[in-house]
């Protein structure tokens, strides 16, 4: 395989496959003190989440599997009735339907990946940004 065997993608091609969430997608409030840039298809949702110290995610469950990558900060995750302290560099896996929640100890940035997509998050996006584009929904 050689680079010269391929054409350089144009801007229209790029827009079909690539998005810069922090520049192109408005923040959606998930819970008070926690906002996210959401990228979604039918197969997955990626949440670029910023959580303020003192934020709380009540214990809940959902039918999606979840992988959380902690980029900055620290939080206490409640998983199946136990508290797990996680911080920058940790990767957390939550199988579908496992009860979980979180206490945000200090400002924290994470990337959450959900499979399949979080329709409830996309509904929040649409409610908060009715005139915005929902990236990748038709890819």
How does the language model describe each region?
Residues 96-120:
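Ligand-binding loop in jelly-roll beta-barrel domains
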Residues 1-43, 127-139:
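A short, N-terminal "cap"/entry segment at the start of jelly-roll beta-barrel domains
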Residues 71-72, 87-88, 106:
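A cytosolic small-molecule/anion-sensing beta-strand core signal
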Residues 50-52, 61-77, 113-116:
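Short, conserved beta-strand element in jelly-roll/cupin
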Residues 63, 79, 111-112, 117-125, ...:
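Anionic, Ser/Thr-rich low-complexity intrinsically disordered regions
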Residues 81-96:
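Short acidic-glycine-tyrosine-enriched beta hairpin
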Residues 32, 46-61:
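Conserved short histidine dyad/triad with adjacent acidic residue
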């Amino acid at each position: 395989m050689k680079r010269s065997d391929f054409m350089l993608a144009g801007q229209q091609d790029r827009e079909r496959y690539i998005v810069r969430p922090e520049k192109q997608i408005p923040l959606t409030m998930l819970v008070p003190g926690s906002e996210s840039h959401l990228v979604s298809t039918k197969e997955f949702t990626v949440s670029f989440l910023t959580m303020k110290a003192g934020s709380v995610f009540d214990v809940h469950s959902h039918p999606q599997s979840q992988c959380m990558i902690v980029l900055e900060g620290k939080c206490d995750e409640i998983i199946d009735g136990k508290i797990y302290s996680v911080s920058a560099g940790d990767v957390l896996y939550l199988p579908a339907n496992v009860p979980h929640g979180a206490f945000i100890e200090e400002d924290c940035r994470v990337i959450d990946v959900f499979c399949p997509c979080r329709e409830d998050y996309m509904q929040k996006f649409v409610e908060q940004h009715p005139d915005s584009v929902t990236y990748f929904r038709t890819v």
